[in-house]
Amino acid sequence: MAGHDVQYGKHRTRRSFSRIKEVLDLPNLIEIQTDSFKAFLDHGLKEVFEDVLPISNFTDTMELEFVGYEIKEPKYTLEEARIHDASYSAPIFVTFRLINKETSEIKTQEVFFGDFPIMTEMGTFIINGGERIIVSQLVRSPGVYFNDKVDKNGKVGYGSTVIPNRGAWLELESDSKDITYTRIDRTRKIPFTTLVRALGFSGDDEIFDIFGDSELVRNTVEKDIHKNPMDSRTDEALKEIYERLRPGEPKTAESSRSLLVARFFDPRRYDLAAVGRYKINKKLNVKTRLLNQTIAEPLVDPETGEILVEAGTIMTRSVIESIESHLDGDLNKIVYIPNDAAVVTEPVVLQKFKVIAPTDPDRVVTIIGNANPDDKVRTVTPADILAEMSYFLNLAEGLGRVDDIDHLGNRRIRAVGELLANQVRLGLSRMERNVRERMSVQDNEVLTPQQIINIRPVTAAVKEFFGSSQLSQFMDQHNPLSELSHKRRLSALGPGGLTRDRAGYEVRDVHYTHYGRMCPIETPEGPNIGLINNLSSYGHLNKYGFVQTPYRKVDRETGVVTNEIVWLTADEEDEYTVAQANSRLNEDGTFAEKIVMGRHQGVNQEYPANIVDYMDVSPKQVVAVATACIPFLENDDSNRALMGANMQRQAVPLINPQAPYVGTGMEYQAAHDSGAAVIAQYDGKVTYADADKVEVRREDGSLDVYHIQKFRRSNSGTAYNQRTLVKVGDVVEKGDFIADGPSMENGEMALGQNPIVAYMTWEGYNFEDAVIMSERLVKDDVYTSVHLEEYESETRDTKLGPEEITREIPNVGEDALKDLDEMGIIRIGAEVKEGDILVGKVTPKGEKDLSAEERLLHAIFGDKSREVRDTSLRVPHGADGVVRDVKIFTRVNGDELQSGVNMLVRVYIAQKRKIKVGDKMAGRHGNKGVVSRIVPVEDMPYLPDGTPVDIMLNPLGVPSRMNIGQVMELHLGMAARTLGIHIATPVFDGASSEDLWSTVKEAGMDSDAKTILYDGRTGEPFDNRVSVGVMYMIKLHHMVDDKLHARSVGPYSTVTQQPLGGKAQFGGQRFGEMEVWALEAYGASNVLQEILTYKSDDINGRLKAYEAITKGKPIPKPGVPESFRVLVKELQSLGLDMRVLDEDDQEVELRDLDEGMDEDVIHVDDLEKAREKAAQEAKAAFEAEEAEKATKAEATEEAAEQE
């Protein structure tokens, strides 16, 4: 038997084919989230407060100090926060001390500082009831960077930039005339010597003394002449810098000094952060710069006078290590005193060495180091600036090397804790201004911290970050793997990062430093490729945010590969040679071969075993978790592996999932750390277990209660359902599974099923990657999933009175109300179809002035006779199912609702979706396809033992795509099924072809692993033998039920009157410009006419056509489409007199936009007509009046006569 048995958890044993001993367990896979947030609460938040405070007022008579803070218990539990659409957050109280310096009075007070979202154990946040994740960001590390550039004449020039965490950039560059310039904060350039003079080293001889004599320095000094003898060189330099930074303002040396101090030397305005100081000290340190250079002067111990290194010695690593303590101490330290007019007048300490130029043995080059300022110095120092200039000048002499900005030593990760700290800092600095003003304005005697602190800027900054930042994302909750993957995601986008359009090819490409740190495979296809990455399985962040990866140390003396683990960043790894994890070892731990495959600074080749420093801990340390779940990954093309890794994240949780027969051994750890399962927190014994809760009695007698979630709606509308795994009496240890989560079986990730798959064509139905499927998979609910959708209805106060939830809905028959309770809300368990009422609701209609009788009726019969309209919540199209739950929120019950809302009802509908034609299926190797036909079991091809095949795939999908892993999996899966075992074949260390064939032989299969298949319809065998086996197939989230859509009559857009688009709006299919061309080209005039009129925006025409169709009459001629009227109105709005005439030259009346609204709007030419009309009307009215008077007069006369 090939392979050996490995136990995964308590419920599963797999036969593993790995040959490499694992010396290091995988770290907790979500520690990047949890550790970062913990660090933020422990010391990050405190540091932010200490950065911004103390705050003094403008006259410096009062000061506000930070004392400490305390985080209290969260207001809601996790479950309550989810139900109430609230955030899972804890109140934070900060203690401040207000010191009045005039009276020495001190007031200490605790101030409520808002609610702070708290991370759950799963590494997520609950914000307004939704589960969110803060994605870690990959950004350029602060530090000093050097680059080279070639101009159009082929001349190589150099550039350098000091990039702080926040503050102004300082750049150096040389031009074609070999003059070196500096730029401050992207302004116009000035000779670099101007900045040196401003720092207090004004004489040319001083400049040559510091930097040594080189062409670049000479040319620049010649360019930088003393223009104004009235000013000293330093003052002149300061004025010149001020002119560049503030053009047009009156320049004085004093204002320039304060400006430069504010720009570079004020910790509030300029911050390198700990990582920036570390990177600058590392880059400008003399140790790295002296490496492999020939020293030109003897190095002498300043205390004893002993010669440590003779002149002419090559400074190898061993020589540098022997004098390391002296290099870190006072060796060759020189103190320069700036003149009194300088920006910073403190003495500048530098380390100065002379080496022989690599390009010219007769020349001596000066190396200036920054003498390692303390880690606490977070601003740039004059020593840093001079050392940077020295490094820059050395580059032209062939010393030092330029930086690669895509190297992971120069890119770091801002995890959730740091991102949050930055937001809080932003809020506090906004608050600071506010506090200063209040301190100055109000009466000092009565002030307390509470009165001067306004917490709104801080809470607003935090709220905005969680609610709308690009890095705060709605958790991808399709299945546990997608959750895990989302928590480990690294994004180069977001505030302070790159943008999609600006990111070039280099940033996106795989870099050699990604090895063991970022997965080279798992990244999205499309515009984000390479900008969104995933942490490799063993990746870990150090305190500066650089990704480390573990290696086994090799003892160079004995050649033994030890089990000592060393975590290295990309920078550190560059100094060593690393052997691959699959290098063969002897029993005693030495390398079995003299030559091993290894890497050094990105060069992959064979190296002598005796120069190897480290060895990989595991073959899977290269890839991310999702990629490590693909068996036979080493046999797949990388593009297909990328799709395979991404598609596993889109798997839908099935009703009864199966773990794969052929796994990689990663399934257990992924399920365990995903946060979707229930894991024992302590050792103990199960005393109670059912579907809703499990109770575990600890050894000390205390009781742990674990609640099991049943059919909760996940973020992506799938059923989040946990299943209890333990029974009463079981003994559990810390870390054991108590319940499986969704897409898990026996404590292992189980995204799909293990159907029997045959590679064969069948009636052409699997053309173009389509999948033919047996009806068994439908009947036996093999690929059935449950989906939950949430619908809500709220009642508000309107101007005409409150809306009401009721059973009494106008014009609705009793049969439509049969499942509503007495309140008018659907009962749980009711089966509902499209259009059924879920919540009966009525809204008051506008009422006319009531007559006396109507008012009387109102008084007698109450409000029943009032006019209301039906605004009930109904089941939308495509959403029929069973009512799973109803939640009612009212003010009376103490629920927090939005203002104006009196009651909120949420209805959850569960749908059971079986697999059907049009659903998307996939394997783990990027082999995806759509179900094209579901064939009755009796018609499917069957094996010689009578077992029908479940799925038929097209064999043409394999060769061109080069994902051969699927075929290996197929054969090994069949052997596993026959032997009744589960198999683990870890990536890059899995089953070899010998293992595969020996297992196939052990299972009693044919030597080519193929078989004869019989046609289920005729019983005849097919002509050729077919590859049949078991392949792990998953159903993806792209389901036909979510996409299928049809419309007859539906909503129309207000302005254009054309049908809306999209399934969500119940829209129509767009018949665009090109489609119209097609009909025109065919000359299909009648079809074209009805598409542009009845079926689109001819308002009267479509009504008449609908009426004619329903009454069976002939359809009348179409009218004018609405879009034509829109065109006419647009031309009229441009001031053109546009009218439409029919064939009899009569003007055609067009519908007005607001019927009846613009009766008083008159066309210019119609004004005369209107005037004439008005005059005629007035004349007629006058005549009528006269006639009336005459008749009245006659009548009176007649009456008089009669009397």
Curated annotation (Swiss-Prot):
It comes from the Bacteria. Residues 1174-1195 have a biased composition (Basic and acidic residues). It catalyses: RNA(n) + a ribonucleoside 5'-triphosphate = RNA(n+1) + diphosphate. The keyword Nucleotidyltransferase applies. GO terms for biological process: DNA-templated transcription. Its EC number is 2.7.7.6. Residues 1174-1203 are annotated as: Disordered. Keywords: DNA-directed RNA polymerase, Nucleotidyltransferase, Transcription, Transferase. GO terms for molecular function: DNA binding; DNA-directed RNA polymerase activity; ribonucleoside binding. InterPro entries: DNA-dir_RNA_pol_bsu_ext_1_sf (IPR042107), DNA-dir_RNA_pol_bsu_external_1 (IPR019462), DNA-dir_RNA_pol_su2 (IPR015712), DNA-dir_RNAP_su2_dom (IPR007120), DNA-dir_RNAP_su2_hyb_sf (IPR037033), RNA_pol_bsu_bac (IPR010243), RNA_pol_bsu_CS (IPR007121), RNA_pol_bsu_protrusion (IPR007644). The RNAP catalytic core consists of 2 alpha, 1 beta, 1 beta' and 1 omega subunit. When a sigma factor is associated with the core the holoenzyme is formed, which can initiate transcription. This is DNA-directed RNA polymerase subunit beta. The gene is rpoB.
